[in-house]
Regions:
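Juxtamembrane/interfacial segments at transmembrane-helix boundaries in multi-pass membrane proteins
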Residues: 16-43
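Membrane-embedded catalytic scaffold of the fatty acid hydroxylase/desaturase
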Residues: 4-14, 38-142
Length: 143
């Protein structure tokens, strides 16, 4: 239990750094391609977050250095929420880089935080054996 708490606490420390970097990118390097008042920006942000997350997760499976930090997530015998919560304590060092494109095109940090939270809820949902296969469009990519 205490190791699990540590693995959740360490990334929280990295959130401050991420917030500073994301804010700088959003304010100074933003290409301003999006009308942030439009509802479709929220949908685009959610889909873009999912795409960035997909590539981050895929690279963690294909690059040995990243796999070494990610493998703990796959060590459980059962596919459930406690297995999903097994995360590396060092991921905050590089995972944030994968989401920078969102800020470059103009997704505001507030929308990013919201869609990241929604994606986290989705990740809890797909990391359970109680939800069956949902088909290729929605189903789990790594089962």
């Amino acid at each position: 239990m205490s190791l699990g708490l540590i693995s959740r606490f360490v990334p929280l420390l990295g959130l401050g750094f991420q917030y500073v970097v994301y804010t700088i990118v959003a304010e100074q390097y933003n290409l301003k391609l999006l009308n942030t008042d439009a509802i479709w920006v929220w949908v685009l942000a959610f889909l873009m977050y999912d795409l960035c997350y997909y590539w981050m997760h895929r690279i963690h499976h294909e690059v040995k250095l990243f796999w070494a930090t990610h493998v703990v997530h796959h060590h459980g015998e059962d596919f459930n929420l406690s297995t999903a919560m097994r995360q590396t304590s060092t991921g905050f060092l590089w995972k944030w880089v994968f989401f920078l494109p969102m800020f470059l095109i103009g997704v505001p940090p507030a929308i990013y935080v919201t869609v990241a939270g929604l994606n986290l809820i989705y990740q809890f949902w797909v990391h359970t054996e109680h939800i069956g296969r949902l088909g290729w469009k929605i189903g789990r990519a790594h089962v």
